[in-house]
């Protein structure tokens, strides 16, 4: 006689709808704090609605998507979930601002093997914090509980952001010319790039140490700096020719993305302090100098090209807005494809 099969539920399969509903309740106040006047409706609809701000006469929408990469593994292993949401927002909105765009709204995707409401609430609270720092609205998202796809409570994040810019205010690098000065903005740490190498180095080094009076793990999990509000003010007052978000690939890979042909960026790598966390990574991993700059931001999270006649005004404004800003190089005439020259590197 065959054993009678019992009825199965979605929860038996590993998906807890009630937990998902509880999460929505908890994050509703987070989304409310980020609300902009253009947003129509609240959370829970099939689609989120947002008007264009009326101040734009000829608006262009700018969209971007990104994740946090394997920095998540470090956060999960150390039970530090409260700031990875800031990282997620930062990686998206910093990409938008380099085109001159004001971020309007943000959506997130949270995927996990088993939904832990406390962890997810902590992550989304960080996303809300990032949206507040960037001035954009958290208007929706997706929480996917996928048993068999992720191990236990491990999770992955993705973000999507839309911004707006006047058509004649789009920054695409076409105005960059020889003689422009390059300003670097200080990074808060490795931001959200290079963590596969970081974790490899950590596996072979002593990590229970302090750097500059702060535990190493605090340096490594410091959230990515969001530059949006200070750069929006800069764009209003200074003729910015281009901006580059220094992410994976570092200065050598990201600066050429905003340079026209027949130009090159010459960077003085001694013009800013090489942060202690990168000194530690280079020493413990025996990482060659160029590989460091091709993997990490090495202390510079954003680069801005401005006419030489406006560099002092730009530096003063950025410092007044709370940024660590420094002159790091200039644009010179080149030959063919845009290039980056890193002066002052040691082997």
Curated annotation (Swiss-Prot):
Where on the tree of life does the source sit, at the highest rank?
A: Bacteria
- NAD listed as a keyword: no
For molecular function, the Gene Ontology terms on record are: ATP binding; phosphoribosylamine-glycine ligase activity; phosphoribosylformylglycinamidine cyclo-ligase activity
Which keywords label this protein? ATP-binding, Cytoplasm, Ligase, Nucleotide-binding, Purine biosynthesis
> What reaction does this enzyme carry out catalytically?
2-formamido-N(1)-(5-O-phospho-beta-D-ribosyl)acetamidine + ATP = 5-amino-1-(5-phospho-beta-D-ribosyl)imidazole + ADP + phosphate + H(+)
The reply to whether Lipid metabolism figures as a keyword in the UniProt entry is no
Matching SUPFAM superfamilies, A to Z? Answer: PurM C-terminal domain-like, PurM N-terminal domain-like
An example Gene Ontology biological process = adenine biosynthetic process
Q: Where in the cell is it found?
A: Cytoplasm
Named in its record, the pathway it takes part in is: Purine metabolism; IMP biosynthesis via de novo pathway; 5-amino-1-(5-phospho-D-ribosyl)imidazole from N(2)-formyl-N(1)-(5-phospho-D-ribosyl)glycinamide: step 2/2
Q: Which GO terms describe its cellular component?
A: cytosol
Task: Quote the EC number.
Answer: 6.3.3.1
Task: Give the record's family classification.
Answer: Belongs to the AIR synthase family.
HAMAP family, alphabetized: AIRS (MF_00741)
Q: What is this protein called?
A: Phosphoribosylformylglycinamidine cyclo-ligase
């Amino acid at each position: 006689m065959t054993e009678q099969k019992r009825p199965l539920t979605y929860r038996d399969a590993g998906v807890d709808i009630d937990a998902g509903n509880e999460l929505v309740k908890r994050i509703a106040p987070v989304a409310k704090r980020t609300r902009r006047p253009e947003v129509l409706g609240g959370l829970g609809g099939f689609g989120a609605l947002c008007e264009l701000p009326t101040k734009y006469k000829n608006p262009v929408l700018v969209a971007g998507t990104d994740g946090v990469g394997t920095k998540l593994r470090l956060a999960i292993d150390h039970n530090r979930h409260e700031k990875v949401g800031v990282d997620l927002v930062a990686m998206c909105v910093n990409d938008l601002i380099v085109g001159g765009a004001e971020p309007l709204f943000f959506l997130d995707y949270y995927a996990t093997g088993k939904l832990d409401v406390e962890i997810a609430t902590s992550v989304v609270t960080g996303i809300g914090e990032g949206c507040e720092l960037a001035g954009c609205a958290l208007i929706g998202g997706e929480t996917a509980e996928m048993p068999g796809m992720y191990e236990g409570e491990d999770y992955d994040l993705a973000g999507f952001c839309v911004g707006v810019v006047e058509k004649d205010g789009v920054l695409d690098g076409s105005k960059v010319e020889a003689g422009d000065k390059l300003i670097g903005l200080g990074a808060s740490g490795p931001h959200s790039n290079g963590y596969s190498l970081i974790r490899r180095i950590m596996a072979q080094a002593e990590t229970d140490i302090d750097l500059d009076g702060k535990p190493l793990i605090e340096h490594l999990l410091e959230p990515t700096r969001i530059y949006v509000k200070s750069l929006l003010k800069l764009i209003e007052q200074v003729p910015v020719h281009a901006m580059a978000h220094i992410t994976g690939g570092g200065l050598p890979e990201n600066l050429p993305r905003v340079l026209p042909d027949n130009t090159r960026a010459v960077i003085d790598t001694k013009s800013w302090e090489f942060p202690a966390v990168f000194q530690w990574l280079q020493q413990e991993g025996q990482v060659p100098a160029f590989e460091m700059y091709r993997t990490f931001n090495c202390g510079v999270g954003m680069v801005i090209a401005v006419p030489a006649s406006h560099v002092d005004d730009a530096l003063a404004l950025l410092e007044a807005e709370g940024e660590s800003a420094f002159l790091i190089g200039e644009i010179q005439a080149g030959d063919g494809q845009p290039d980056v020259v890193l002066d002052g590197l040691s082997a």
